Design a protein with these regions (language model features):
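Conserved phosphate/ATP/ADP-binding segment of small-molecule kinases
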Residues: 118-194
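Phosphate-handling active-site elements
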Residues: 29-34, 196, 222-235
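Charged C-terminal helix
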Residues: 230-265
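Conserved N-terminal subdomain of the carbohydrate kinase-like
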Residues: 2-7, 27-110, 114
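Short, small-residue alpha-helix embedded
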Residues: 20, 144, 206-229
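Short pre-catalytic strand/loop immediately N-terminal to key active-site residues, enriched for Gly-Thr
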Residues: 8-14, 195-209
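N-terminal basic/disordered segments at the start of proteins
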Residues: 15-32
Length: 265
């Protein structure tokens, strides 16, 4: 029987990120995906400006009731968007004693510079992170969660990971990607004692829309199969590295990663 994974996240109408990226990842990795929508994100055809439409809490809770009644082997969160949504998600995690939880602390839409809801950083930090098996911030998100200066080096990553770990996550995975001052695309996994590096060749591309969502979804999929966190991250790193390497142009504004790259190339 297929393992079941729930994503609590936003819908990206362009199909590259959010629950669309999650479901594509789940399908590619042979797990059964379910969704609970928190927001719908659209983009203007003229300049690709983002608009975020929140889903009502009552509608979100109805979705959660449905998904949890089916049974869930792992859970992943993406764009939650408000303190109320974070608290609702946390209540369902507690009620159903979920253990395999991947928190992708989404704070911005790709292409946007502003934090969507600045107050969500505090709620993510104080309410949700302590419930995570793995939390997967990028460099910007990690600096926000750790309340640190911008992260530029591997030592900066280690300091931020330790600060985030103190908030209660079992594992902290900071994604260095191509932004870190390092010869390779490096991600750092910290379990409170040991630092483990996951490396891949850097890819000079802007066609990486949905990379963070896809990476976290791949980790959740592998955890659902019973893999250790280290093995799940290693397999997910291989999956996302190939997906980024074969990212493609969707239109004049955006290019997503290719979820099928692991079997096509």
């Amino acid at each position: 029987m297929l393992q079941k994974v729930l994503t609590i996240a936003g819908s990206d109408t362009s199909g590259g990120a959010g629950i669309q990226a999650d479901l594509k990842t789940f399908q590619e990795l042979n797990v059964y995906g379910m969704t609970a929508l928190t927001t719908i994100v659209t983009m203007s055809p003229e300049q690709w400006q983002h608009q975020v439409f929140p889903i009502g809490l009552d509608v979100l809770e109805s979705q959660l009731k449905t998904a949890f009644s089916v049974g869930i082997d792992a859970l992943k969160t993406g764009m939650l968007g408000s303190v109320d949504v974070i608290e609702l998600a946390a209540s369902y995690i507690d009620k159903h004693d979920m253990k395999r939880i991947v928190i992708d602390p989404v704070m911005v839409c790709k292409g946007e510079n502003e934090v969507l809801h600045p107050e969500t950083a505090d709620a993510l930090r104080e309410v949700l992170i302590k419930r995570a098996l793995v939390v997967t911030p990028n460099l910007f998100e990690a600096s926000q969660l750790a309340k640190s200066t911008p992260i530029k080096t591997l030592d900066d990553m280690k300091e931020a990971a330790a600060a985030i770990y103190e908030k209660g996550a079992k594992y902290v995975l900071i994604k260095g990607g191509k932004q870190l001052e390092h010869e390779k695309a490096v991600d750092l996994l910290y379990d409170g004692k040991n630092y483990c590096l996951f490396e891949a060749e850097k890819v000079d591309t802007t066609f990486n829309h949905g990379a963070g969502c896809t990476y976290a979804a791949a980790i959740a999929a592998e955890l659902a199969k019973g893999r250790t966190v280290e093995d799940a991250v290693g397999l997910a790193k291989q999956f996302i590295s190939k997906a980024v390497r074969h990212g493609f142009r969707l239109n004049d504004f955006v290019g997503p990663v290719m979820h099928a790259a692991h079997r096509r190339f």
